[in-house]
Curated annotation (Swiss-Prot):
One annotated GO biological process: actin polymerization-dependent cell motility
Location of region: Helix bundle 4: 766-785
Family: Belongs to the EPS8 family.
Residue spans of biased composition, Pro residues class: 208-221, 618-645
Disordered as annotated region, ranges: 1-39, 201-225, 298-320, 612-689, 787-822
Organism phylogeny: Eukaryota, Metazoa, Chordata, Craniata, Vertebrata
Protein name: Epidermal growth factor receptor kinase substrate 8
Amino acid sequence: MNGHISNHPSSFEMYPSQMNGYGSSPTFSQMDREHGSKTSAKALYEQRKNYARDSVSSVSDISQYRVEHLTTFVLDRKDAMITVDDGIRKLKLLDAKGKVWTQDMILQVDDRAVSLIDLESKNELENFPLNTIQHCQAVMHSCSYDSVLALVCKEPTQNKPDLHLFQCDEVKANLISEDIESAISDSKGGKQKRRPDALRMISNADPGIPPPPRAPAPAPPGTVTQVDVRSRVAAWSAWAADQGDFEKPRQYHEQEETPEMMAARIDRDVQILNHILDDIEFFITKLQKAAEAFSELSKRKKNKKGKRKGPGEGVLTLRAKPPPPDEFLDCFQKFKHGFNLLAKLKSHIQNPSAADLVHFLFTPLNMVVQATGGPELASSVLSPLLNKDTIDFLNYTVNGDERQLWMSLGGTWTKARAEWPKEQFIPPYVPRFRNGWEPPMLNFMGATMEQDLYQLAESVANVAEHQRKQEIKRLSTEHSSVSEYHPADGYAFSSNIYTRGSHLDQGEAAVAFKPTSNRHIDRNYEPLKTQPKKYAKSKYDFVARNNSELSVLKDDILEILDDRKQWWKVRNASGDSGFVPNNILDIVRPPESGLGRADPPYTHTIQKQRMEYGPRPADTPPAPSPPPTPAPVPVPLPPSTPAPVPVSKFPANITRQNSSSSDSGGSIVRDSQRHKQLPVDRRKSQMEEVQDELIHRLTIGRSAAQKKFHVPRQNVPVINITYDSTPEDVKTWLQSKGFNPVTVNSLGVLNGAQLFSLNKDELRTVCPEGARVYSQITVQKAALEDSSGSSELQEIMRRRQEKISAAASDSGVESFDEGSSH
């Protein structure tokens, strides 16, 4: 029910892993042996001896480890792939380009084979008999994957061996390698069994720093009863009703906002849009990887003669599985929220503009709709609704193909809140991001007020999500005859499972969420009490190794979100959250009021746009050039005439216009002329505004709006580099641009000329932020050309004149004429 209309059960089930590092399974039942034994003393002695021996055997029979499959290479001299070191070198290159796609699985070792098992279905993916394993090696701390297990396997049917690489976090690669090597040694008939001792060593090994959690810590469990559902929804509805009549036109007090307030609000919207685009990009890459794996799997099956599964097909089958339905629903919700944000930011972002980004987003939206087998699943996504401004903006912006796709998604994508029945409950939308990031609070709204409203909205959204899952569970028991999902093309959803339900059925399912017209909050509702914040100071630098961890620098002040385990979840001053080991943190006293969590400085760019698919050609005129007034944080200005943006690539930077500048009126006027066809007197409902601006525009009390809001200004000097810059200058410039330590250390050894000589692909190979570095270098080059172009031309003309004068003085008028003719 969390914005999802569903009448069909989901056939996906999650199986929690019971294997954490080391496990075992007995080989036979001791009870049967006891029943078959004689009662003589000799038999009793033999029985006890066998029991002791078999206890060791049962412990060392099977061991299981949770690992991440990184990639598989074919060892071929033609590809310069001969040794494990060659594979690690190629893994580094793939990692630098962002082309490593990990897959969680179970690696199982027994006395006959090494097997790979699907984490969810528990099906065996691959089976490598011990006699086919030619080499086993642990590679520690050689790249960003710090615990790599390498297996070289060659079956009799293969011409060339395969190199399989795994990242091992929970149990380190050197321990797993010892287990496999001992199993291989024992299988060759050695007199002394090595494996029991190896397994005892593994089970007694001190893990050192504990492994990070696989997912953020869960919220405290709460009882979600029918009364709880009604009271929470009543509280939300009462608050919404208290803000104004249902059909009352919008009476926002944006005119009372200071330029600093508006800048802070826009900054946060841009950050949210950044993370939405990142999550959509990640999901699209996931789909593309699944499609590539399915294509390779189909190719192998066509060329295969027998029915026996070939080497590597098990892992390919796992990689070809599409994402679960909940991830598709989350992606569709982020598309809708992204469109709402673009409509709000259309006057504030440029290069590319909001209209360009709309064209860009329709390309992956079309891909996701096709991957689900049609618009049915997207049509079931109710929350968040597009607001009136967004619908008008899309009507004005989209081209013919985009409009056809948009209209095919139905009323949940084309109707604003005012067009839905008043009694129709629309759950609030609280976006959750893959890396755990949460939008920073707006200080001028009052932290307590905004946090209470945010928690209320999140509580209602959680209740709606719980109700939706309960409904799916109930329907799955009633309709057990529904066929399971079997993709026809490896990543397309079966349309007979996800069909759009009628609004009548959806209304019946939401009967528990019927809002009340009462203007007062239910007195039985008790808002969540906020715990006092705790802070810690990092003693050392720590570099994150995966998406759940957080990179921190020495002396960083971090807010502690969860300290119940050995790895603490913390949030830095920029609003990013993740896990760090608790032994690098010192508890500190909370900072003074108002200084606990400052708004992060605005970066003025949406940087991470690395998707390879490009936007359709836009029908709108190009974005206006940036205003001459500098932005709040000084950055080098681009040249007056920006270079044309190629259609096949998405631009790397999105800058926003300075909304607090008095000189930006020209750009705003031009923008208003572009959108003059948009109706300006459209009425909006208050509930629509609640849906549109759930997180960061819930309310601003009139008393709070009258308070003077001060944003501390940072006098950051402008740092530029030239072709003559030293490596120290380059390092300082990289740090001033906010690049991570890996990028600074990798490129900080180059001088200005060397850095300017690198192209985008070379930069991407050197560091993960290569695309962003290239865009900043382009800006620097343009600024240098703009400032030095005229002086260089004058220098060339001066040298030419000196050469002509010298020729004239040496050879007379005739020589001068000859020089002129040339």
